[in-house]
Amino acid sequence: MSLSERQREEINRAVAEYLQNNGYSEAFNMLLKEASLSENDIKPLGGILEKKWTTVLRLQRKVNDLEAKLLESQQEINHGAPTRDKRQAADWIPRPPETQKLIGHRLPVTRVIFHPLWTIMASCSEDATIKVWDYETGQLEKTLKGHTDAVNDIAIDAAGKQLVSCSTDLTIKLWDFGQSYDCLKSLKGHEHTVSSVTFLPTGDFVLSASRDHTIKQWDISTGYCVFTFRGHNDWVRMIRISHDGTLFASGSLDQTVSVWSLPRKQRNWYFEIMSMRWSVSKPEGNSTHILFSGSRDRSIKAWNISTGEVIFTLSAHENWVRGLAFHPKGKYLVSVADDKMMRIWELSAQRCMKAIEAHEHFVSTVAFHQTNPYVITGSVDMSCKVWECR
């Protein structure tokens, strides 16, 4: 394809403007001479060369996305799977490529969560910050600073008005979320790294887990610890609460996973495991009390909370399983691991139905939006990614 005389003149003027605006005077004068242009010919074009360049890049990304979706659709047709238009919302799962890659943290991302109502998400990192993003546009909205060491976990209350964070600096912080983003309270009482934190469904209490072997319950109105759960003999790495708020699970480096009764303030049962690192999660809206745990032994286990027995085991990851998240309808489980993969499991068939290479380094965390078709992941590569479900 050859350019017309007018198109060549427009390109010459745009390049000349770029050279002039960026101080390349020698190249600018040489171009004027060789292209038979005068300075009067160089009218302000508003940085048209840069605009065309960025437009080409955006179009190329769109072309790549469309080609990936076309390839995926062709593969689904070849394998007899339903195409996107014929899939029900209950069958939507995350699919590549990612719609956004969020860059801003300076150290590994430790946790990602969605806001329950708005199109924003939050991420925390070993760089001691919490960042708030618009997950549809990829825009960084706010950076929360206050911790002096790695932020290990964050949670948002059901109303979406408050965020709680915990850190290696031994503190738990309560933040206003959505208005001022100010730190409202600092909760102190743990004697070592605070590794996990969660709101009770009522929003008036917070649970925290620590390397000091304890789990504490805090009244957020006063900032006081109202109860300390004891029973683990080593670092309590993670806690997660059931949707009705009556039970919570904890995973520890003492090689046990425990289930506790909040009303009775006691441990219902604990089960010894052969693994050292746990991610525990509880499917929403499930009348049967089932707990899923992911471990350093590369497996995911489903537990009967009433008996403490393993119901089944899912195996496919090739390294530590770091995070779990449930599909809103409870049909699928999403897992991420140090093998850099995100896997989608069909629970009824107990099989891995899709594997996605999610990041260039270990994938440390995952979250599934409860109403909108999005999944987010965070990684040791310091990035977060947004995945559309379809």
Curated annotation (Swiss-Prot):
Domain note: Dimerization mediated by the LisH domain may be required to activate dynein.
Keyword list, A-Z: Cell cycle, Cell division, Coiled coil, Cytoplasm, Cytoskeleton, Microtubule, Mitosis, Repeat, Transport, WD repeat
Compartment(s): Cytoplasm, Cytoskeleton; Cytoplasm, Cytoskeleton, Microtubule organizing center, Centrosome
WD repeat boundaries on the chain: 104-145, 146-185, 189-228, 231-270, 272-313, 316-355, 358-390
GO biological process: brain morphogenesis; cell division; establishment of mitotic spindle orientation; germ cell development; microtubule organizing center organization; microtubule sliding; nuclear migration; retrograde axonal transport
PROSITE patterns referenced in this protein's UniProt entry, alphabetically: LISH, WD_REPEATS_1, WD_REPEATS_2, WD_REPEATS_REGION
Keyword Transmembrane helix: no
UniProt family annotation: Belongs to the WD repeat LIS1/nudF family.
Domain of life: Eukaryota
HAMAP family for this protein: lis1 (MF_03141)
Main localization of the protein described in the UniProt heading: cytoplasm
Free-text function comment from the UniProt entry: Positively regulates the activity of the minus-end directed microtubule motor protein dynein. May enhance dynein-mediated microtubule sliding by targeting dynein to the microtubule plus end. Required for several dynein- and microtubule-dependent processes.
UniProt-listed SUPFAM superfamilies: Lissencephaly-1 protein (Lis-1, PAF-AH alpha) N-terminal domain, WD40 repeat-like
Domain LisH: 7-39
An example Gene Ontology CC term for this record: nuclear envelope
Organism of derivation: Caenorhabditis briggsae
GO molecular function: dynein complex binding; microtubule plus-end binding
PANTHER family in UniProt: TRANSCRIPTION INITIATION FACTOR TFIID (PTHR19879), TRANSCRIPTION INITIATION FACTOR TFIID SUBUNIT 5 (PTHR19879:SF9)
CDD domains registered for this protein in UniProt: WD40
Coiled-coil parts of chain: 54-80
Name of the featured protein: Lissencephaly-1 homolog
